Structures are given as C-alpha cells and as structure tokens.
Amino acid sequence: DGKKDQSYFLSRLTQNQLSSTIFPLGAMTKDEVRKIDVELGLHREGMDESQDFYGGDYTDLLNVQDRKGKIILADSGKCLGFHNGFWHYTIGQRKGLGIAYSEPLYVIALDSRRNEVIVGTEKATRETTLLALNPNWVGEEDFEEGKIYKAKIRSTSRGEDCRAFRTPDGFSLEFISPVKAATPGQSAVVYDGDRVICSGVIERAE
C-alpha cells in the first residue's frame, strides 16, 4: 500500500534483523485490512484512524518547564521576538511563530545552547546537499557511486532525485533540485525504485 508505506521508518533495520521479520499484511492495502477489521467487529465503519503514537502535545512528554528565549533573524542577527522554549519548534515550521515580518518566515535552525530559534525566508530553507552519518547499507551490493536515486528526508516525502556518494562515515547526497528543510537528526533514506539502498542520520545540509 503506497499510501501507508513504512519503509522510511524500517530503513534502520539491518539485514540480520529483517531476516527474522514477517509482514503478514504486506500484500494488502489499509482499506482491505480495515474492511476485515469491521467484519470482525474490531473497528466500527467510518472510524477515524490514528496518525500519531501520542494524542496530546509531544512537549508534555519532555517534562521541561518553559524558558524564555529569542527568535533571531538569520540574515541580520536581529531579535524579532521571544518564545517559551526552542523545543516547541521544528525545522521548517512557518505557522505559530507569533512574529510579524515583511514576508513569511520559517524556522531554519534551533540553538539549544542559547535557547534560540533561528528564522529565515523561504529561500533559506532550501538546500542542495546533505551529509548523513551512521549508515545502514540495506542494499549495499547494488549501490553505484554517483548514480541518480530517490531520497526521502521525511516520512511524507515522495522522494527527491539526487546523486549519492560514499563518505568515510556515511554518505552524501547532491539533489538535482533544492529540497526544503533537511533536518539534522532525521533520517535520509535512499531508494532505487521501491527498494531501500541505504539509510543514515542527517548530520548537516546546505
């Protein structure tokens, strides 16, 4: 089921782990599974499906008290406003910043040491290269240096065309067209068609 593909999350599993894994619903769509659930009385028809592992605000799980910090414009270093903790924000976020500017602003970096949220224009969110570390070479035998692959930098991505290269500690990607808000700490997953070739943790993007 392409709409429910979980390969982005499973890409960190090794071949040894996958060899002991069974996906009994792998050949079925979510709609087909839901129909069986309804027939068995496990779900009622029309019931909303769950999208998250936690129904509340994820910041509740951090058990951290709010702490005032600055919202900084990247280009000038000017303070545009204040926030209650950098952990309330995500890279690429546009809504809910609570500041006014001549054009839309996006979160482009989070400085945990200074408790600062760095913002910039849409152009500042675009990157053409990234470095990923801690690689998991799922399809290493089929990897070709410099070949054009599809890469996902978030689970909801359709995949972006890029060239992939090995590095001493991982791999680098050069995107054919700029991508938006490649976030350090998130996974970068490289595909050849629908097959995962490798996965790594984004170290930086520019």
Residue ranges and their predicted role:
Residues D1-V196, V201-E206:
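Nucleotide-activated chemistry modules centered on ATP-dependent adenylation/adenylyltransferase
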